[in-house]
UniProtKB/Swiss-Prot annotation:
Family listed: Belongs to the adenylate kinase family.
BP GO annotations: AMP salvage
Protein name: Adenylate kinase
Top EC class for this record: transferase
Keywords attached to this entry: ATP-binding, Cytoplasm, Kinase, Nucleotide biosynthesis, Nucleotide-binding, Transferase
Record note on quaternary structure: Monomer.
Residues that coordinate or bind ATP: G11, A12, G13, K14, G15, T16, R127, Q173
Chemical reaction(s) catalysed: AMP + ATP = 2 ADP
Binding residues for AMP: T32, R37, E58, L59, V60, G85, F86, P87, R88, Q92, R133, R145
InterPro entries: Adenyl_kin_sub (IPR006259), Adenylat/UMP-CMP_kin (IPR000850), Adenylat_kinase_CS (IPR033690), P-loop_NTPase (IPR027417)
GO CC terms, sorted: cytoplasm
Subcellular location: Cytoplasm
Function per UniProt: Catalyzes the reversible transfer of the terminal phosphate group between ATP and AMP. Plays an important role in cellular energy homeostasis and in adenine nucleotide metabolism.
Length: 193
C-alpha cells in the first residue's frame, strides 16, 4: 500500500487528490487540519494543547502536530497512508523523517502538485464563493498564504528532491487528468517495486 506525502500551494488540489487516492487504494488519508479539529472536539490532551494556540490565532507547535501524526501512523502501517497538509516546514519534514525511523516506516513518494500563482488565486476565489470559506474569499489573504507557502513549504521541494523521492505533477489541468496521471505514476512504481 502506498505511503505518500502531498505538497503544493494552497488550492493546488492536494486534499481532493489525496482523498481520491485514499478511496482507490483503501488507504487512510491523514490531514493535519482534520486531525486538529477532531482532537480539539474530542478534548484529548493533544487537542486541548492545540486549542490554546488555535484560540489565540497562533500556529500549533510542531511537537503537538507530530504527536497527532504519530498516533495516526501507528494505527495504519500495513494499510499505508497519505499525508495531506503535513509537513509544511523543513523542521516538520525532519521531525517526520525521525518519527518514521522510530516507527520502522518509510514513505514511497512525495507528490508535488505544481500550479501557477494566478491559477491558485482564481481557484481559491472561486472556492471561497462556492463554499463560503472566508480564507479563500479575499485575494489579499490568498496572496499572503502563497507568500507563507513560498517561504515555509517550498523549501521542502529541494529537501525531498535531494532524497530522490519527489515527483512533480502538473496540477494545472482538470482534476480527472491529474488523477489519471497520479494513478499511472503509482501503478508504474508498483510494477517496478
Amino acid at each position: 500500500m502506498p505511503r505518500l506525502i502531498f505538497l503544493g500551494p494552497p488550492g493546488a488540489g492536494k486534499g481532493t487528490q489525496a482523498e481520491r487516492l485514499a478511496a482507490i487504494y483503501h488507504t487512510p488519508k491523514i490531514s493535519t487540519g482534520d486531525l486538529l479539529r477532531a482532537e480539539v472536539k474530542a478534548q484529548t490532551p493533544l487537542g486541548c494543547q492545540a486549542k490554546v494556540y488555535m484560540d489565540a490565532g497562533e500556529l500549533v507547535p510542531d511537537e503537538v502536530l507530530i504527536g497527532m501524526v504519530k498516533g495516526q501512523l501507528q494505527h495504519s502501517p500495513a494499510q499505508g497512508w497519505i499525508l495531506d497538509g503535513f509537513p509544511r516546514t523543513l523542521a516538520q519534514a525532519e521531525a517526520l523523517e525521525e518519527l518514521l525511523r522510530e516507527l520502522g516506516q518509510d514513505y514511497d513518494h512525495v507528490l508535488n502538485l505544481e500550479v501557477p500563482d494566478d491559477v491558485v488565486v482564481a481557484r481559491l476565489l472561486a472556492r471561497g464563493k462556492e463554499q463560503g470559506r472566508s480564507d479563500d474569499a479575499d485575494e489579499a489573504v490568498i496572496l499572503k498564504r502563497l507568500q507563507v507557502y513560498r517561504e515555509q513549504t517550498a523549501p521542502l521541494i529541494d529537501f525531498y528532491e535531494a532524497r530522490g523521492r519527489l515527483r512533480r505533477i502538473d496540477g494545472n489541468q482538470p482534476m480527472e487528468s491529474v488523477q489519471e496521471h497520479l494513478r499511472a505514476l503509482l501503478e508504474g512504481f508498483r510494477r517496478t517495486a
